[in-house]
Structure formats: C-alpha cells, structure tokens
Design a protein with these regions (language model features):
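Surface-exposed loop and adjacent secondary-structure segments within mature catalytic domains
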Residues: 16-30, 69, 75-81
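Aromatic-lined glycan-binding groove of carbohydrate-active enzymes
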Residues: 45-99
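Short acidic/histidine-rich active-site segments
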Residues: 61-66, 127-152
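C-terminal helical cap
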Residues: 96-115, 119-122, 169-184
C-alpha cells in the first residue's frame, strides 16, 4: 500500500525467508553478493536466490572486498581471533593494537579482484536468472575498494569483463539498471493495487 521497496541486505537468513513468505511485491538486496562464493552472513544463500527469482526481486552485487573474497573473509576472522587472544592476555588497547600490527605484517591482507566480482554476478545469474541480478557497489560504506572498481566510473571495465564471458548487450542492460527499474515499477503497481486494502496484522 505504501509503495515501499523492501531491502534485505542487512538482515539474517531467517528474516530473508520471513519477508519472502509474506510479501506480494518484489524485494531487493541493495548490496549483497553470493554466499556460495563467500560465506559471509550478509551474502545471499542459493536457496534464497531461488526464492528471489520466484518473488521477482533483484540481488545487487556489492563490491565490499570481504563480501567478494572468501580469503579476505577468512583473514578478517583470523584477525578478530588474534585480537581476542591478545586482549585475553591482559594487554591494554595500545598493546593489542601493536600486537595486531605485528600480526598483520606476518599475515598480509589478501586482495579481491574485479574477476571475482564478475564471478558473483555470474553465479547469481546462474541460480536466480538474468532478470534478478544487479549492481550495488556500496562505495560510500567501505574503507577500501577492489582494484579496478574504485568508483562508478569503473563500471565499464566490469561490463567488459562480463562481455568477454559471453554476456549480451541485453543481459548487460538488465544488470546495469533495467532489472531494478522493473522492480520499482512493480512495487508501485502493487501499492496501487492494494491501496484500498486494510493492513494485515496477522502476518
């Protein structure tokens, strides 16, 4: 009724499914990637990807390095474990920070790549379909970027990579914005259809 576009990027898997159980309008994930390629809880599992396809929604692949590279995800978990270990030894904040610096020198942060971003896009297309994948860089929410994807000015390089993998111009147009525009139009249509209906508090 409100024409609200529901974004599931910051929710748990249980909440993803709860929303998909009750919504009659398509949803989006504005900045999430494929959990099958990077087991981050903010990424979308294949089972949910299939439900998004049934719902008519779109998963917009993010460029957050830790959501793209499993190596970076593992590195972050290892760094957190080392921080907790140092804190448990009784070190103050400065000592813990110094210890983490030493640890990071011995364990350099891996880098994600543009090719890995393309892998996530391709995986979501393969599981959910070309009509249900988009781009959601999240440049304003990350401390570092992926080489070759520093801003929206670098999107052509990503599209070129996908074109090399066989994506058609029509596929790329859907990815680059047409899919999200379709969802927005459908959400507005559902709002108009339900404008006179009372709220359903049972669900």
């Amino acid at each position: 009724r409100l024409g609200m576009l529901v974004d599931l990027s910051h929710v748990s898997e249980a909440t993803m499914n709860d929303v998909l159980d009750v919504t009659s309008a398509p949803v989006i994930f504005s900045h999430s990637s494929a959990r099958a390629l990077d087991n981050h809880p903010r990424n979308v599992p294949d089972a949910v990807l299939r439900r998004v396809a049934q719902n008519g929604g779109v998963v917009m692949v993010t460029f957050v390095p830790g959501f793209i590279s499993q190596e970076i995800r593992d590195w972050s978990l290892a760094r957190t474990a080392e921080r907790d270990r140092l804190a448990a030894l009784g070190g103050n904040d400065d000592q813990v920070a110094q210890g983490l610096t030493v640890w990071a020198e011995a364990n350099p942060l891996p880098q994600a790549s543009l090719s890995q971003v393309a892998d996530h896009i391709a995986h979501i297309r393969d599981v959910a379909g070309i009509d249900h994948v988009g781009l959601g860089g999240d440049f304003d929410g990350i401390p570092s970027t992926i080489p070759g994807l520093d801003s929206v000015a670098d999107y052509p390089g990503l599209l070129e990579e996908l074109a090399r993998r066989g994506w058609s111009d029509a596929d790329l147009a859907k990815l680059a914005g047409a899919n999200v525009l379709r969802v927005m139009r459908r959400v507005e249509a559902v709002a108009a259809e339900q404008a006179g209906e009372p709220a359903n508090f049972a669900s």
